[in-house]
């Protein structure tokens, strides 16, 4: 059966609104990402123990040793990732890991979002590295394979939005 889903554009708009001393200091940034054919939008409940949130691998990868609350995705086709902490009290911690077992963490405070900067032509391939400043070069990035998450004090609802080609 042939797909009846037509590719579409994802329009991402970030708006800052602030007036200081009577002058508008805000700004708007827009990005259009073409050829989107798949969108996953989920709200998941994250406890205080670290748990798999998103997984990435090659299309032929059958490694399913880990469970991911929001799903597993083909690393080559992901074009946009947004993770929003919907809680009004607690922060969450995101831990991102690449194929070289490099990890880095990001605190996402109550009501805040984290947008992962994918490669608009190559997905999450060669987009993540963690090392001291002297160890990072333009060619040292590895494939993002894993995003795990934990809440700091009490469970938090987290919205995950992933768009793919």
Predicted regions: what is each one?
Residues 2-165:
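Surface-exposed, low-hydrophobicity beta-strand/loop segments enriched in small/polar/acidic residues
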């Amino acid at each position: 059966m042939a797909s009846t889903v037509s590719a579409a554009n994802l329009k991402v708009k970030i708006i800052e609104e602030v007036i200081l001393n009577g002058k508008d200091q805000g700004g708007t940034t827009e990005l259009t990402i073409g050829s989107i054919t798949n969108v996953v939008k989920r709200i998941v409940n994250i406890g205080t123990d670290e748990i798999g949130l998103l997984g990435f691998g090659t299309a032929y990868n059958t490694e399913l040793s880990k469970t991911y609350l929001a799903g597993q995705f083909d690393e080559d086709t992901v074009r946009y990732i947004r993770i929003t902490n919907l809680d009004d009290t607690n922060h969450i911690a995101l831990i991102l890991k690449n194929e070289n077992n490099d990890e880095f963490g990001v605190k996402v405070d109550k009501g805040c979002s984290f947008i992962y900067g994918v490669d608009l032509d190559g997905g999450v391939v060669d987009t993540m590295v963690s090392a001291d400043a002297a160890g990072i070069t333009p060619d040292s990035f590895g494939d993002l394979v894993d995003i795990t998450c934990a809440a700091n004090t009490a469970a938090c609802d987290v919205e995950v939005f992933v768009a793919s080609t």
